[in-house]
């Protein structure tokens, strides 16, 4: 009798364990498939590559690497005395041609007033032509002066927006050329997440759907919403040869790797530079509504945590 009872107990326990295992496997399967998710997501921000519009020696650097700067804050200056001299020269040219043009205008007016009775028509036309030529020369000098003024203003390189200076590689006394990138500015309040989700999961994603973002190595869960889905990605399986013929890569019919599509995610609140642009995160699309952590069983919370690594 005891042997029979023991066998029945073992059988019942085994069945219970099997049922529990089936339930756990089912719950895990549902959890992994009900919500589109990926561990291939990156924090991203708008980055401005700052390059000077003039060439010259760097006179002063007023910021340090990774410093938070405000809009129009001076980053560095480039040889202002040289460009001030160029502006002074251009202003002198303008003054000279203004004086010459005044003289030519009076001469042309005098000859036009005297008329052909006092001098030849050629002399009158020559005076008018000289006046027009000087007028054009003055306009050119004014344009050169305005350009010199603009160059002088551009010797002071300012931040186009608030943000963090990064990869600062300019130093006082260094010669810098026009158009060469000198520093990158990560714009403040421009952070978002780019999640690369498999094409098989796109059916469960719509703009406006709520998203949970877990930075790699962090217990903090950020929230956001789907902003947009990329309209296309590069077809890596097809290229064109030198003769314009299509070249298609060989593929195994029973092995299909899902293409990853970028999905842009808007963050509800900006994290500042706590999670720098380029760092990794796990993203879960929860649907039209946020998922409440208080209603989630402990087991599901554990699975949610393990999903970051698994």
Swiss-Prot record:
Job of this protein: Forms an efflux pump with AaeB.
Compartments (UniProt record): Cell inner membrane
Main location: membrane
Similarity comment text for this entry: Belongs to the membrane fusion protein (MFP) (TC 8.A.1) family.
GO cellular component: plasma membrane
TM ranges: 12-32
Gene giving rise to this polypeptide: aaeA
Record's keyword annotation contains Transmembrane: yes
Molecular function per GO: transmembrane transporter activity
SUPFAM superfamilies the record matches: HlyD-like secretion proteins (SSF111369)
Protein name per UniProt: p-hydroxybenzoic acid efflux pump subunit AaeA
Keywords noted in UniProt: Cell inner membrane, Cell membrane, Membrane, Transmembrane, Transmembrane helix, Transport
Alphabetical list of InterPro entries matching this protein: CusB-like_dom_1, CusB_D23, MFP_Efflux_Pump, PHBA_efflux_pump_AaeA, RND_pump_MFP
Top-level taxon: Bacteria
UniProt xrefs under PANTHER family: P-HYDROXYBENZOIC ACID EFFLUX PUMP SUBUNIT AAEA (PTHR30367:SF12), P-HYDROXYBENZOIC ACID EFFLUX PUMP SUBUNIT AAEA-RELATED (PTHR30367)
Mode of membrane association: Single-pass membrane protein
